[in-house]
């Protein structure tokens, strides 16, 4: 996993999408224009956490290296060090795989 020098703030995470399959199980090659963006990714970096009502920082439940599922429209696409990544809030994450 390549490290990034970008540190998200608060309850945000930086996610690298997992590459989708180039072929179907039947062997049909899927062109880039027909591929759906995967809704699965690996967390690259995490923020320090959100603050609760008393001002205490609540750490995130996820960590760098976790493989996650997220919503189709979750996050903001950014390019960091030439790599396409997503920045999203922890609340946009549906769950951790594995």
From Swiss-Prot:
Compartments where located: Cytoplasm
SMART domains with a match to the protein in the record: Cpn10 (SM00883)
SUPFAM superfamilies reported in the protein's UniProt record: GroES-like
InterPro entries, A to Z: Chaperonin_GroES, Chaperonin_GroES_sf, Chaprnonin_Cpn10_CS, GroES-like_sf
The keyword Chaperone is assigned to this record: yes
Family annotation (PROSITE patterns): CHAPERONINS_CPN10
Molecular function via GO: ATP binding; metal ion binding; protein folding chaperone; protein-folding chaperone binding; unfolded protein binding
Family: Belongs to the GroES chaperonin family.
PANTHER family membership: 10 KDA HEAT SHOCK PROTEIN (PTHR10772), CO-CHAPERONIN GROES (PTHR10772:SF58)
Subunit structure, as described in the record: Heptamer of 7 subunits arranged in a ring. Interacts with the chaperonin GroEL.
Protein name (Swiss-Prot/TrEMBL): Co-chaperonin GroES 1
Species of the source: Rhizobium meliloti (strain 1021) (Ensifer meliloti)
Lineage: Bacteria, Pseudomonadati, Pseudomonadota, Alphaproteobacteria, Hyphomicrobiales
Gene behind this protein: groES1
């Amino acid at each position: 996993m390549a490290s990034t020098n970008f540190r998200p703030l608060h309850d945000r995470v930086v996610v690298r999408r997992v590459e989708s399959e180039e072929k179907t199980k039947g062997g049909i090659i899927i062109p880039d224009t027909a591929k759906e963006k995967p809704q699965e990714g690996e967390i690259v970096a995490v923020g320090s956490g959100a603050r609760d009502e008393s001002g205490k920082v609540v750490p995130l439940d996820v960590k760098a290296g976790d493989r996650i599922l997220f919503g189709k429209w979750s996050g903001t696409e950014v390019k960091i060090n030439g790599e396409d990544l997503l920045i999203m809030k922890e609340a946009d994450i549906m769950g951790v795989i594995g």
